Amino acid sequence: MSPSLTWHDVIGQEKEQPYFKDTLAYVAAERRAGKTIYPPQKDIFNAFRLTELDQVKVVILGQDPYHGPNQAHGLSFSVLPGVPAPPSLGNIYKELVTDIPGFQRPNHGFLQSWAEQGVLLLNTVLTVEAGKAHSHANLGWETFTDKVIAALNEHREGVIFMLWGSHAQKKGRIINTERHYILKAPHPSPLSAHRGFLGCKHFSQANQLLQQQNQQPIDWQPKLPAVE
């Protein structure tokens, strides 16, 4: 891949597509109608802002944003500082404690330090109405995030995709396993984590795969930003 390729180069043209304009117009109209939509407008595309195309080492695919106040900020599974870790993230931490030597469960759920190291925290749907899970499914976001996965598949090599649950695994069918690595497990939700997410060792496996490619492993201990 040419290291100069950016998200703008490979998916920028999506902004001109009718489906994309329709999706953004729907979200804007819902906000104008007084509905609370998460995440805030400025945060919808945070995953791409924090993890540029040529920096992506790992992709963790989520479904849609958290739908409670002050949780979602554009990164899958992550919540803003000061908000308790939701149950799925609690199970991710539980797995990290057993998988990564020295990992200590943080008292927050802010995963931006992962994104800054090359972990693309991508939800397949990028907005949600407050209190209504999956309310923005089938608007058009899925088409956009399929294009994102296709761009990674085509323009990068050796990316590690963590696909948790059937939704993510279906989404990942287009990934060429001769060019990339796929780690599959049940979803970390309390409904399914005990069926094999806990014990999957995806985080240590990802670091082994990165080291085999002479890449810096991920420091999975989430860090809060230093207070200025």
Swiss-Prot record:
Catalytic reactions of this protein: Hydrolyzes single-stranded DNA or mismatched double-stranded DNA and polynucleotides, releasing free uracil
Main localization (coarse): cytoplasm
Compartment(s) where it occurs, according to its Swiss-Prot or TrEMBL record: Cytoplasm
Pfam families with a match to the protein in the record: UDG (PF03167)
CDD domains: UDG-F1-like (cd10027)
Keyword field: Cytoplasm, DNA damage, DNA repair, Hydrolase
Gene Ontology MF, one: uracil DNA N-glycosylase activity
Family annotation (Gene3D superfamilies): Uracil-DNA glycosylase-like domain
GO CC entries: cytoplasm
Catalytic residues (positions): D64 (proton acceptor)
BP term (GO), one: base-excision repair, AP site formation via deaminated base removal
UniProt KW Hydrolase keyword: yes
InterPro entries the record matches: UDG_fam1, Ura-DNA_Glyclase_AS, Uracil-DNA_glycosylase-like, Uracil-DNA_glycosylase-like_sf
Keyword Ribosomal protein assigned: no
Enzyme class, spelled out: hydrolase
EC number assigned by the record: 3.2.2.27
Function: Excises uracil residues from the DNA which can arise as a result of misincorporation of dUMP residues by DNA polymerase or due to deamination of cytosine.
Family as reported in the entry's similarity comment: Belongs to the uracil-DNA glycosylase (UDG) superfamily. UNG family.
Descriptive protein name: Uracil-DNA glycosylase
